[in-house]
């Protein structure tokens, strides 16, 4: 008679424990009335927007860059205007949503405003995130949930840094991973990742609130890359290696996966959309945490990030996203013959760079 292996049984116990420890309760979600978001970039603003628009809670946004906060609010205004034009919201409803989005100067104001759930959504840097979690543990009440939108960093490491600098109180049991996907208003998935220290009630509240935001929740252990990036990033990295070793052009790599595998985007186009710096950081985490050579970042990916070719957000990545310059006046064009300014750098994979 065949018996399941011990590793299979342990995985089954883990799945069952999540099912029992994470009830789908409206009561758990209703405990969250005010959300604080650290980071007003595309991810942070998207999280705040959906929390205010769909979950209907008060949202406080903070960012060390005032210009980023202004850009974030302008983006929210544009989203609301689009929803009104499409008839998804009335003007009054849009005003109500906008009224629930507020800017504060710093994390200390989260505590003053009674934040129930704080979500960190900054760059994938462990030291930066650790500083934020120490500040959250210092300024938020013991009942508040401290969540991270990290896409690869260990939640248990982040939880270990959630110690109040004033009282020494350890808040590790309040920390949970809350990985949203870009663009947050469109993508319906959230990965839920408990740290080793996370209390089951925190997981229950986080799951319930994600569902209140209209999201589908998948659960993962605190393992490098979780589910999504453990699968996605090696795929993107291998596409970079296929390009750098001359196996195929960028266009043929992307066309093969789009037309042959029915992927909506090719791996190199997707890398540009995510951000090549983000892809590289995640690959470095996977490689460092597992020690497995299959996660070693592509040399090409590393070089492109060093050259500050980050993809769409920088204007150049595997493809060129810069607007085409207008043609020069005839006199200028004639004068430029045999000289003139050097051409701007081309994306990797163009005929003059491949």
Language-model segments: which ranges?
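A general alpha-helix detector
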Residues: 79, 188-189, 235-242, 266, ...
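Hydrophobic/aromatic beta-strand patches that form the interior of the parallel beta-sheet core
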Residues: 60, 102, 119, 176-178, ...
